[in-house]
Amino acid sequence: MSKRRIAPLTFLRRLLLRILAALAVFWGGGIALFSVVPVPFSAVMAERQISAWLSGEFGYVAHSDWVSMADISPWMGLAVIAAEDQKFPEHWGFDVPAIEKALAHNERNESRIRGASTLSQQTAKNLFLWDGRSWVRKGLEAGLTLGIETVWSKKRILTVYLNIAEFGDGIFGVEAAAQRYFHKPASRLSVSEAALLAAVLPNPLRYKANAPSGYVRSRQAWIMRQMRQLGGESFMTRNQLN
């Protein structure tokens, strides 16, 4: 009897290990490949596309137009750093003090959860993982973050982030966002336009760059102040991000 009970557990354990090994090879290959090759699509884009098809929205197309950092306004990179991760050039994928503050805040305010994901973590999550909150997903995100921080330069992480970030319903990447909202290429985005796009990033399906709420305008102004405090364009040059 004991052998019959153990056998299925052994099989499941081996199956799980094989699945994890296959995922490790897949993700590791993706990290290596996308260190030099433009990213054609992300997990978030695939998830949105499949969801649209299942809902009968066959006209929905989730895609992004890849552009190099040379074709992105330096204000855009600075805006997302100012908004999302001001220690981006310094850390190895995780902002520990910010995580500690977020945990303390969430213990006091269970109804208003605060995140502390760095740009590196967001890039790993958007590129390779599914939406949702779980310890398994967080563990995978941490491993993938370490992977891209080890293999990619900070400039590459920022470039990929800007090309796969969601800026609205079906709008992925800064080039698509610049064309949709401002009718210009990403290379010509101004300070205020870059800050406005960065302002919707916490929830691009709720906040609208083409119809900004008072909160979005307030956040845009705050981001512009942070951009000045970081040192403007010189911040990007000093940290070899443009």
Swiss-Prot record:
Q: Where in the cell is it found?
A: Cell inner membrane
* GO molecular function terms attached to this record: pentosyltransferase activity; peptidoglycan glycosyltransferase activity
Question: Which pathway features in its UniProt record?
Answer: Cell wall biogenesis; peptidoglycan biosynthesis
User: What InterPro entries does UniProt report for this protein, alphabetically?
Assistant: Glyco_trans_51, Lysozyme-like_dom_sf, PBP_transglycosylase, Pep_trsgly
Please name the Pfam families in this protein's record.
Transgly (PF00912)
Keyword field contains Acyltransferase: no
Q: Which residues cross the membrane?
A: 19-39
Q: Which domain of life is it from?
A: Bacteria
**Family stated for the protein in its record:** Belongs to the glycosyltransferase 51 family.
Per the entry, what this protein does is: Peptidoglycan polymerase that catalyzes glycan chain elongation from lipid-linked precursors.
**Protein name per UniProt:** Biosynthetic peptidoglycan transglycosylase
Give the source species. Answer: Salmonella paratyphi B (strain ATCC BAA-1250 / SPB7)
The gene name on file is mtgA
